[in-house]
Amino acid sequence: MSFNFRIGQGYDVHAFGPGDHVMLGGVRVAHSHGVLAHSDGDVVLHALCDAMLGALALGDIGQHFPPSDARWKDADSAQFLQHCDGLLRERGWRVGNADITVICERPKVGPHAVAMRERIAGLLAIELDAVSVKATTSEQLGFTGRGEGIAAQAAVLLGRTAVPHQ
């Protein structure tokens, strides 16, 4: 049986470290810390990539962009998202919508949410209203609550655009 829709979910987390900004959804956000990561550490785009890959059972971001590979040192996570989108399109799928939640006490995400939505929609060539970015705190519980790091969750709905050749 073949369906014309698939769903996927992703999660990413990074600890805070030295720096003066974090990348969130492809947007540079000023912050008192950076993140400890091999690439630019964009938890939003990393979670979104994992959701997209998971929807088609294509593995995870670590398999496609291993931290052991020097090519990805300090890489712009927009590259990762475009690669994942290309894999979907090659197989006849597109992102129908994406729903992303950032979990942190700081930085405040709200003032940057529209810019993140615009960046993600542009990278995926989808409508702005197909991308949701929102934030929550963990009520000062756990590592995000103590301000030690940042996390993101993403859910996607994929739609079939073409039946791949057999």
Curated annotation (Swiss-Prot):
Keyword Acetylation in record: no
Pathway info: Isoprenoid biosynthesis; isopentenyl diphosphate biosynthesis via DXP pathway; isopentenyl diphosphate from 1-deoxy-D-xylulose 5-phosphate: step 4/6
InterPro entries: MECDP_synthase (IPR003526), MECDP_synthase_CS (IPR020555), MECDP_synthase_sf (IPR036571)
Site note Transition state stabilizer, residues: 38, 137
Cofactor(s) listed in the protein's UniProt record: a divalent metal cation
Cofactor note: Binds 1 divalent metal cation per subunit.
Keywords linked to the UniProt accession: Isoprene biosynthesis, Lyase, Metal-binding
Gene Ontology terms, MF aspect: 2-C-methyl-D-erythritol 2,4-cyclodiphosphate synthase activity; metal ion binding
Residues that hold a divalent metal cation according to the record: 12, 14, 46
Residues holding 4-CDP-2-C-methyl-D-erythritol 2-phosphate: 12-14, 38-39, 60-62, 136-139, 143, 146
Entry EC number(s): 4.6.1.12
PROSITE patterns reported for this sequence: ISPF
GO biological process, one term: isopentenyl diphosphate biosynthetic process, methylerythritol 4-phosphate pathway
Transmembrane segments: none
Catalytic activity: 4-CDP-2-C-methyl-D-erythritol 2-phosphate = 2-C-methyl-D-erythritol 2,4-cyclic diphosphate + CMP
One protein family per Pfam: YgbB
Function: Involved in the biosynthesis of isopentenyl diphosphate (IPP) and dimethylallyl diphosphate (DMAPP), two major building blocks of isoprenoid compounds. Catalyzes the conversion of 4-diphosphocytidyl-2-C-methyl-D-erythritol 2-phosphate (CDP-ME2P) to 2-C-methyl-D-erythritol 2,4-cyclodiphosphate (ME-CPP) with a corresponding release of cytidine 5-monophosphate (CMP).
Family, per entry: Belongs to the IspF family.
NCBIfam families, per database record: ispF
Subunit structure as annotated in this protein's UniProt entry: Homotrimer.
Name listed for the protein in its UniProt record: 2-C-methyl-D-erythritol 2,4-cyclodiphosphate synthase
Source species: Xanthomonas euvesicatoria pv. vesicatoria (strain 85-10)
